[in-house]
Regions:
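Intrinsically disordered, low-complexity regulatory segments in ankyrin-centric signaling systems
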Residues: 18-55, 64-67
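Ankyrin repeat A-helix N-terminal signature
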Residues: 39-44, 72-78, 105-111, 138-144, ...
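Ankyrin repeat structural motif
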Residues: 45-53, 78-86, 111-119, 144-152, ...
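Alpha-helical adaptor scaffolds
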Residues: 67, 71-83, 87, 93-121
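Leucine-rich solenoid repeat scaffolds
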Residues: 140-182
Length: 182
């Protein structure tokens, strides 16, 4: 009998929690909208994106890690979503809190078509992240040789070095420098 009563109370508690009215707090609403927006980017939900675009939502909104919907969509391989964001005016040059861009994320994940599309934007090909690395260095490290040629054609310096002395050219040849042990 006790088990039955506890089960009944547990069900009643969950029901009461599920029936709470939506919040009118602007901060809560803003956070919920951000969550929907970023989840749409991860999933590639174009209908949801269209709703955000049509409502005038800021396409370059960043989460607590500095990720934009474009960075998330590129990283998760959502090509049509990336294209729609760029056509609607999203900024491909925005960096997350570590300084990485959508292009760097696409290269890291091996999303070559997305990376090629991002290369067609007006971003500096030698833009550096917080560790001093460029998109070309990512392409070299992860053996995305076809992208190295495109980055070079766009003006990327394949001999530029990060603080450790790595360059895209060295990384592409398999030479990786690491920090000296302390």
């Amino acid at each position: 009998m006790r088990t039955f009563i506890w089960s009944l109370l547990a069900c009643w508690s969950m029901n009461a929690l599920a029936e709470q009215p939506p919040s009118n707090d602007p901060a809560v609403i803003k956070a919920q909208l951000q969550d929907y927006y970023f989840e749409a980017a991860r999933r590639g939900d174009l209908d949801m994106l269209t709703t955000f675009i049509d409502s005038g939502y800021s396409l370059n909104t960043q989460d607590d890690k500095g990720y934009t919907a474009l960075i998330l969509a590129a990283y998760h391989g959502q090509g049509p979503f990336v294209e729609r964001l760029l056509n609607a005016g999203a900024d491909a040059c925005v960096q997350d809190k570590r300084g990485n861009t959508a292009l760097m994320g696409a290269i890291f994940k091996g999303e070559l078509k997305i990376a090629q599309r991002l290369l067609a934007t007006d971003c500096n090909p030698d833009q550096r992240n917080g560790a001093g690395q460029t998109a070309a260095m990512y392409a070299g490290l992860f053996k995305r040789v076809e992208l190295l040629d495109e980055l070079k054609a766009k003006g990327a310096d394949l001999n530029a070095e990060d603080p450790i002395g790595n360059s895209a050219a060295r990384l592409a040849s398999g030479e990786i420098r690491t920090p000296a042990p302390r």
